[in-house]
Amino acid sequence: MDTLRSISSELVRSSQLRWTLFSVIANMSLTLSIWIGVYNMEVNSELSKTYFLDPSFEQTTGNLLLDGFINGVGTILVLGCVSFIMLAFVLFDFRRIVKAWLTLSCLLILFGVSAQTLHDMFSQVFDQDDNNQYYMTIVLIVVPTVVYGFGGIYAFFSNSSLILHQIFVVTNCSLISVFYLRVFPSKTTWFVLWIVLFWDLFAVLAPMGPLKKVQEKASDYSKCVLNLIMFSANEKRLTAGSNQEETNEGEESTIRRTVKQTIEYYTKREAQDDEFYQKIRQRRAAINPDSVPTEHSPLVEAEPSPIELKEKNSTEELSDDESDTSETSSGSSNLSSSDSSTTVSTSDISTAEECDQKEWDDLVSNSLPNNDKRPATAADALNDGEVLRLGFGDFVFYSLLIGQAAASGCPFAVISAALGILFGLVVTLTVFSTEESTTPALPLPVICGTFCYFSSMFFWEQLYG
């Protein structure tokens, strides 16, 4: 009961979780619309018999389940080979090849798969033997494909709005799901789903798993690469205009964390500065005993402050190995001139409430180390525990399960499978997900969805024959 209460409270509290569930529902609904409305849940036998075994084809073992198992294993072997090839490119720093691969895959879906779907839809509406209707079909295919393709380019390859990127993620994953439903023979889909379940566990959790190793090299790539492979439910962008209070709380939390990090950094820096100044005093005393600083010396601070921003000067470049008198004298004079310069002190500030926003912005922008100002990488984005992310493959296989459930012709089974997927996803993201590690989002939803589907089918057949 405590677990259920925790799940329900997290579902109520997190707008990211609710938006992710809504996106999954939209993805499954769009897949069903195309799968049923355009293709009438029929497999493309011409394409399917080229690559798979089935009793209705010439190439078959004669056993439906054995054919499905062989097809499923073969599909995962191909997936594994592609994954390890990509892993090799990543490990050996073939960054251009990796980016080109991801880019071409995205463009193929935006222009190729979408155009094929539009062709299959409009060819059923218009008579292809009539020239006028044939030309109308071409126009209705080309124009939407160009608009959709270039819209997707803007969404995936530029700094577009997050909602636009999410829309194209949902539609692209639906197109891929329908393509798989059209290619896989009837029972092959179930074997593919269950075998890919174990593959996902290996790829994400095993030390030599492809996704595990790729994450270790994520710091070599810009965070923009994630736009091509992951769905992000960014709460700050998501709630724009709809939940301003929650957004402001998130911004305030970010400011407080930044302030805390800044205080810790300059507290450590002050200790290093004290040690440095002590060395300077010793040098002065060794060269000229009369130059030993007194209590009025600028080197002695009347009141120590936990945070103090000092301008860097050339004396910081002095080392213990420097013994030249002229260099020491130069360092002393530079230090004295530096001490007379303007110093920004924030010793009395410890929380965000004690100063205005502009003062903290200046503090953070001017005082953080250079390493904190580097461009954000994919590793930084993946390690951000405040953003909920799902891989494109998760959306694809959720919809693949729903499409296969719809092929049974039982609406009750489809709804049950969808509820099972959503329940498994909620449990995965609330109970098993942690900020320290990546949690596979495919196994539990597939298990719950499959269980709910077959259970509902069993009860449906018992009740209605």
UniProtKB/Swiss-Prot annotation:
List the GO biological process terms. amyloid-beta formation; calcium ion homeostasis; membrane organization; membrane protein ectodomain proteolysis; Notch signaling pathway; organelle organization; protein localization; protein processing
Cytoplasmic compartment segments:
1-18, 93-96, 158-160, 212-389, 433-439, 461-465
Which membrane topology describes this protein?
Multi-pass membrane protein
What residues make up the catalytic site? D200, D394
Q: Where is this motif: PAL?
A: 440-442
Q: Chief subcellular site?
A: endoplasmic reticulum
SMART domains listed in its UniProt record = PSN (SM00730)
One MF annotation (Gene Ontology) recorded for this entry: aspartic endopeptidase activity, intramembrane cleaving
This protein's UniProt keywords? Differentiation, Endoplasmic reticulum, Golgi apparatus, Membrane, Notch signaling pathway, Spermatogenesis, Transmembrane, Transmembrane helix
Which stretches are tagged as biased composition: Low complexity?
A: 326-350
* Annotated transmembrane regions: 19-39, 72-92, 97-117, 137-157, 161-181, 191-211, 390-410, 412-432
What job does the chain carry out?
A: Potential catalytic subunit of the gamma-secretase complex during spermatogenesis, an endoprotease complex that catalyzes the intramembrane cleavage of integral membrane proteins such as Notch receptors (lin-12 or glp-1). Involved in spermatid formation during meiosis II. May be required for proper localization of macromolecules that are subject to asymmetric partitioning during spermatogenesis.
The cross-references to PANTHER family, in alphabetical order and at most eight, read:
PRESENILIN, PRESENILIN SPE-4
Q: Which family does it belong to?
A: Belongs to the peptidase A22A family.
What is the protein name stated in its UniProt record?
A: Presenilin spe-4
**Gene for this protein?**
spe-4
